[in-house]
Structures are given as structure tokens and as C-alpha cells.
């Protein structure tokens, strides 16, 4: 969902010049775990944690916006209707519904995933192997993007 900021300019430029695209951070630093539900909740530990000093502050500045959490709520509601997780719909959307031309779509674009342990890796890989999302979930993710778009982080810093 957050990766869509690259759609209007970067993806067309890369396509024009034959450059493959590899995105990173498809789970918004773990925000798609669903553990944090509000910008007002600042955990002590973890990537968004207050003890993470500069990194925690950077991630909170990047993602802790009302619109982001509104979008996550839209996505989570859609996921729950199909017994899916936020993590799963984020990864499956990147592979099957984004403008990336992944191998699933005959291209070489890719998605870099990051994990903290083997269980997360196995779960993410299993989710990446699943097929496209139900149409109503994709529609909800489009709605979520519209909710978050105005305050979404840019692809350039």
C-alpha cells in the first residue's frame, strides 16, 4: 500500500529505460503486523520504539500519521472478511496487484522482505507463493491508498 507513491513517476521512467524495479519495506517496517493501532501508541522496543533513538523517530515520522492508521483499518477490515492477515495482503498485493512486473507477471521486478526470525521468513515466503487476492480486498486496498496517499512517504528522501 505504501509503495504506491512510485506509481506516477518512477515506474513509468524505469519502464521507459528498461530498468527493473525492486522495492523494499513492503510491510512498512512491520506496521502491517497490526500490533500498533494508533500514532499515539509509541512502543518502547522495536523499530518504532522510543528506545530505537534516531531509527525509531525516523520510522514514526514516516508512518505515524492519522491517515496511515485509517488506511490500515480499511485494509485490516478487508483482510478479516477473508480470514487473511495484513502481512499477507500486503505481500500478495505487491506480487499480484501492484504495477510491479514480478515473475508472477512475467517480469524481473522484485520485493525485498526483511524478517527478525525464521518463523517470519517462512510465513512471508508462504504468503508470497499464494495467488492473487479476492477482488473486494484489492478494491479495499485501493480505498486504503486513497486514504493514505496525501500523507504517504515519498519514494525519494
Q: Which residues does each predicted region cover?
A:
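Beta/alpha (TIM)-barrel catalytic core signal, keyed to glycine-rich beta->alpha loops juxtaposed to Asp/Glu
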Residues: 1-148, 154
Amino acid at each position: 500500500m505504501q509503495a504506491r507513491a512510485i506509481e506516477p513517476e518512477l515506474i513509468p521512467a524505469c519502464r521507459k529505460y528498461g530498468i527493473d524495479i525492486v522495492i523494499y519495506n513492503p510491510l512498512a517496517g512491520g506496521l502491517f503486523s497490526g500490533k500498533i493501532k494508533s500514532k499515539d501508541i509509541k512502543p518502547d522496543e522495536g523499530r518504532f520504539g522510543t528506545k530505537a533513538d534516531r531509527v525509531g523517530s525516523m520510522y514514526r515520522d514516516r508512518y505515524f500519521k492519522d491517515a496511515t492508521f485509517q488506511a490500515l483499518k480499511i485494509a485490516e477490515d478487508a483482510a478479516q472478511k477473508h480470514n487473511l492477515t495484513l502481512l499477507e495482503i500486503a505481500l500478495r498485493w505487491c506480487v499480484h496487484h501492484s504495477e510491479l512486473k514480478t515473475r508472477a507477471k512475467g517480469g524481473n521486478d522484485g520485493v525485498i522482505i526483511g524478517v527478525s526470525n525464521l518463523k517470519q521468513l517462512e510465513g512471508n515466503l508462504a504468503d508470497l507463493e499464494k495467488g492473487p487476492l479476492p477482488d473486494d480486498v484489492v478494491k479495499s486496498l485501493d480505498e486504503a491508498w486513497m486514504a493514505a496517499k496525501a500523507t504517504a512517504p515519498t519514494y525519494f528522501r
